[in-house]
From Swiss-Prot:
Probable guanine nucleotide exchange factor (GEF). Transmembrane segments: none annotated. This is Rap guanine nucleotide exchange factor-like 1. Residues 1-149 are annotated as: Disordered. PANTHER family: GUANINE NUCLEOTIDE EXCHANGE FACTOR, RAP GUANINE NUCLEOTIDE EXCHANGE FACTOR-LIKE 1. SUPFAM superfamilies: Ras GEF, Ubiquitin-like. CDD domains: RasGEF (cd00155). One of its GO terms (cellular component) is plasma membrane. Residues 424-660 form the Ras-GEF domain. Keywords: Guanine-nucleotide releasing factor. Residues 49-64, 120-135 have a biased composition (Low complexity). One of its GO terms (molecular function) is guanyl-nucleotide exchange factor activity. Disulfide bonds: none annotated.
Amino acid sequence: MKPLEKFLKKQTSQLAGRTVAGGPGGGLGSCGGPGGGGGPGGGGGPAGGQRSLQRRQSVSRLLLPAFLREPPAEPGLEPPVPEEGGEPAGVAEEPGSGGPCWLQLEEVPGPGPLGGGGPLRSPSSYSSDELSPGEPLTSPPWAPLGAPERPEHLLNRVLERLAGGATRDSAASDILLDDIVLTHSLFLPTEKFLQELHQYFVRAGGMEGPEGLGRKQACLAMLLHFLDTYQGLLQEEEGAGHIIKDLYLLIMKDESLYQGLREDTLRLHQLVETVELKIPEENQPPSKQVKPLFRHFRRIDSCLQTRVAFRGSDEIFCRVYMPDHSYVTIRSRLSASVQDILGSVTEKLQYSEEPAGREDSLILVAVSSSGEKVLLQPTEDCVFTALGINSHLFACTRDSYEALVPLPEEIQVSPGDTEIHRVEPEDVANHLTAFHWELFRCVHELEFVDYVFHGERGRRETANLELLLQRCSEVTHWVATEVLLCEAPGKRAQLLKKFIKIAALCKQNQDLLSFYAVVMGLDNAAVSRLRLTWEKLPGKFKNLFRKFENLTDPCRNHKSYREVISKMKPPVIPFVPLILKDLTFLHEGSKTLVDGLVNIEKLHSVAEKVRTIRKYRSRPLCLDMEASPNHLQTKAYVRQFQVIDNQNLLFELSYKLEANSQ
């Protein structure tokens, strides 16, 4: 399990899919590629030059830690080159079909999982509830749609079948609606999707009798499901909002035709109001309320607040530092571009009266605790959620770029007893689960699709997912930090014992995200090398930790983990990076479009994965948390960890504790 220590080395490069221009070599677990900032995959300080960020080129290579990836290709074999439109080349074809399977979805004859002798299984029917990258795509349970269709015609075909009742039962209709709504953005942009829906309803208005009525009812059903799924995500899409409003007015004109659908039209009215943001004037719109990003400010009242979902138009406070470590505090939209941020900094620095070109003389740089620097391009946006755990934004001139150094308090941590020595494992585990449930609930299910499939375009829609991934990395570094700051060998062994207890309790709470993060923190190379400390651990806890390592073992596509989570009932907090890995294999393992034709089986498999996430959150979390005298203090501690994310510094601390350990 040694590769576990490589988990989410650096959010700036791993989560955002960026190429980092680094300072000093990062070593294991630092920014850059597998070798860190100064190793293979990282920029090498001044020699690396000022390199811009390349975001999310491939989630399987950039987001996922090494232990989650598939084995490398054989020497001499070139990886598939993505074709125009972002689709990977070299997709396997269906035997005997002459090409990939598109819209004709029929059961393949013959024995085995691909053949007859039983119904085709959906991904959720596997023992793991997680789609294995090695499994074939699965056909949807609804009837075949017939001949291949282009994206602009597929929606019409689906609406025709809904209007004609060809799906035979309501369950198949619901799955059909859900598949198209969840995955339409893979082949049809949202605004285009709504335009097609609007045009279909207008054409149905010229038809007489049951046929026209059936088409309008199908259009109403599709719009309702679309709005019910997207809701808040559409609040920032002005073009989509106008189309929805026009379609809503058309439907309400024919309200008398929907006597049997009175509840649906009422629901439509409520949903459209949500999209249009009809908020009383005396209340400040949510998009204008300043929301705290954890780690930006350490005020107790902020970190104790229940987490709410972020949107691109939300405003936050953020510090932007100067080369001398002075700073200005700016108020900015979460989706603000680098150019907008520099404009706010320029105004704060009272440069506004200078010549117009003065703003362009400043650049924005993300500097990590290890000294690695990333030059941000003026057109980049949503940079706040892509920052690493201890990374900060610096505004400087190009001449002072090389002189930038990290803030001193981030690389000088005084050892000694911390809060972890005073709290009970049960309290820590429960607060971890409660906080991570809040963060997990904030992630819209479509953020997973946008993150994997849309890259740059989905940046502002994936802020909550990126914050959850950043938190997972933070917990991992917190475990390593606390162990390595404990100088007394006896206390250090007790701390290992406490963290193993916390991992066990998180697993009991069905919080597998925290469980994974704690185990990987203990498996950090700087911690696992402390042989003398581990020898002091009782045999019972050594055996328990071995079981945890086996559970997090990536062998056979994480078989142990998948078997455990398949037996859990909601609510469950899954190990989110593994969901992204599965979606990435779906994306890169088969094409969405070939010659303009839509691969329906891929859409259905992606939708099944999203429904798995929905299932995990289908019930509320209920923890038996007794209010202790230090309840708020423990809650604040768990939500605002102070960590060292510089792996070189962690190794230095480790060698000071046990210089000769192997």
